[in-house]
Structure formats: structure tokens, C-alpha cells
Amino acid sequence: MLEVVAVLLRSGERFLLCQRPEQKAHGLLWEFAGGKVEPGETKRQALTRECREELGVEIAVGEEFLELTHVYPEVTVHLTVFCAELRSGRPQALEHRALRWVTAVEAGRLPLSPADVPILRQVERLQNKNKMEAHGMKSKVYFTREITPEKVVEMLNALNAPLTGKVAAKVHSGEEGNQNFLYPEFWRPVVEAVGATVVECNTAYPGARNTTAKHKKLLEKHGWTKYFPVDLLDAEEPDLELPIPDGLVLKKNLVGKDIQNYDSMLVLSHFKGHPMGGYGGALKQLSIGCASSEGKCWIHSGGVSTDREKFWDNIAPQDSFCEAMADAAGSVVRYFNGKMAFLNVMSNLSVDCDCCKVAEDPCMKDIGILASLDPVAIDQACIDLVYASDDPGRAHMVERIESRHGVHTIEAAAKIGFGSREYELVEL
């Protein structure tokens, strides 16, 4: 294993990135300055030397920022990242092609070395946390007890959502025979309000949605094509691979390639129980919902298999599955880079998902509609509303959520850092 150090060198909200020379391994990719720890050196000594050789500066090495291991095909790297301050000199590209002081947003647009992606993610997490704490902010989740198509539009308007360009509206088309899914007539006003295309993906297991031909017939039968343009994102191969270098379980996610045709996404979720995930909401729509049929196998297996024929033979341990869903959801959130909005409707509250041909009837009375720009917060709020309910059927729903460790998906998503479990519930 190769011991490597890197430096997080800041100037206000910006930090220094270096572009590797074209002729070197991973040429033209951007990275944090640093290098190998030589025999006899401490990590701090190595970092001081590397900054002197690479950048022509003297630094004061501060606290440890992050420690990680990254496996390249040719070598495994153990990387320790330190914060540091400039003591003297101005950074120069002595061993790099170029240097650039960037914000986290600007860094996210650059091609980063794979081992450096987790460093950027940690910077983003801390910046978001610090900003929210500094302003006493929590993620806003809007809530209404009135469940109507018109109210859905009102909830979306409350978000002032950044849905620009070509908008995808992710729905659940409903398995054939399922009586609980939300019909296209319910979603029609909000989809039309943003001029969206309804998008879906094929399933991995047998049913009416596991091939493009069958799924298209079902979409027509359920009325989706009557009202909207509809796009099966994985109708044609190859899938689009979204990298997850810092994933808890997955290192990549496989989504329908046509997701590339959209600039933003409106995620429309029917909150309910789920036989495998404990519950289904925004995080499930982002993960399993946006995954291609092979991508669904990949998530359910915890990154072991994409073989649809052996789907049920490769089911991951439950916590790994929940973490894989969180990994996959985070990759889609990062892909759209903030251009997303989430609506969860808590009606037809069965313990079973809309993917079940034979689903239990609702066990609880309807609760309401929630809206947020934070997929973690909106799912946490739905869970909290279930637990706070005095409905006699609450126990059945809670048992389903807890027996499948459903909240662990939310915990994992918050740990990854693309949303927060802390929220402010604003009732409209």
C-alpha cells in the first residue's frame, strides 16, 4: 500500500487544485497538491516537502482533515489529507500543468482524480453544514393535510424550485394489478405546470414492467401516455454509469442513459411501506427508481451482480442494501447538481409498494402532501408523521419500516451528505 499525503490549502471560500501533466498517469485530471511519504518521513514532513517541491511555498501544517483508502487497478493508496496555511511564497505550477483556486461548485465541474473526489465531497458537506449552522437554518419541508392535484401544484410553487431547461418528472407507473399507486390524473396538473416529460425505468424481476415492450403497454393501459410524453430511460442500452468513488457500498450506479436528455428532475413519490426497503419515498425513487434494470440488480445485490436471471440469488444483507440505495440516490442528486425538487404524497398508505402486483390495502388513513428541495429531510419528515399518528394502523406500518431497517437508508444518505435529517416543517 502506498502512503500518500495531500493538502487542503484555502483562501477564503476557495482552495487550491492542481492539474496533472498530460504525460503522467491520470494526466490532465485535477487533484489536491501532495505526494508520497518517503521512508523515514512523518506525514507532516512529507507534506511540507511536497509543497516546497511542487508549489514553491512553505506551509504550516494544521489538523488532519480526512483519511481514506482508494484502490486503483495498479496500486492501493492510503491518503491522509491535512489542512494547512501558507507561511511564505506564492503557489507555482512547478510540477503540474496548471493551478487553480476554486470554490466547491467550480471544483465539481472539473475532472478530478478518483482518489480526490471524496476530499471534495467532505469539503461540500462541511461547507453546507457550516452555512446552515451559521444562519440557524434547517431544510424546509412544506406540509399540507389536503390531498388534491391542485394542492400538489401549490406545494411545488412554495418551493420556488430550480427546475430549468428540459424537466424530467420521475413517477411510479404502477405494477399491473396494483390498486394503490397514484394515477396519472392525480399528477397531471403538476407535470403540466413545469412542462415535464414523465420518465420511468424497467424493472429487474418478472412482471409487467421488466421489458421495454411490456412496460410501454402498461404505461398506455394505466393512462400515462394519454396525458404526457413518456420516456423509458433505459429502453435502449448502454446504461449511463454514474461514479460513486466515495460510496458506502457502491462505487458506481447504472441509470437509464436517457437521463442525459434532461436538465432537471421533479421527483414525484407515493410514500408507503415497502416489502424490501421498509418504506418507499424520495430516496427509493432516486435510487431503485432511476436505476436501469441491471442497475436495480446492482443496488439490490450491494454491488455484486447485474445478472437479472440471478436477481433473487444475489440479495445483499439488509443494511448493505439500504446503504447501496443511499449511494445510488446520492449519485443522481449530484448528477443534477441542485436542479431537483421532491414531492411525497402520503395517501393509500399500504405496507406494500406500488411495485407489488398483489398489495395489501391501506392500513392507515391518509396524512398529506410534503414538498422539499432535500430528499433526506422529506423522507425523514414522512417517517416522523407516521410515528406521530394516532391511527390504529400505525403499528403495522411501523413494524414494516423497522423490520426492514428502513430508516437506515435515511441515516446512510445523511452520512453521505446530500441531505439532512434536521428539518423545519412548514404547514400550509
Residue ranges: model-predicted function:
Residues 7, 43, 47-51, 64, ...:
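Hydrophobic packing within well-folded, soluble alpha/beta domains
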Residues 115-131:
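Charged phosphate-binding loop/patch that engages nucleotide di/tri-phosphates or the phosphate backbone
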Residues 17, 81-83, 99-101, 285, ...:
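Conserved hydrophobic/aromatic beta-strand scaffold that supports enzyme active sites
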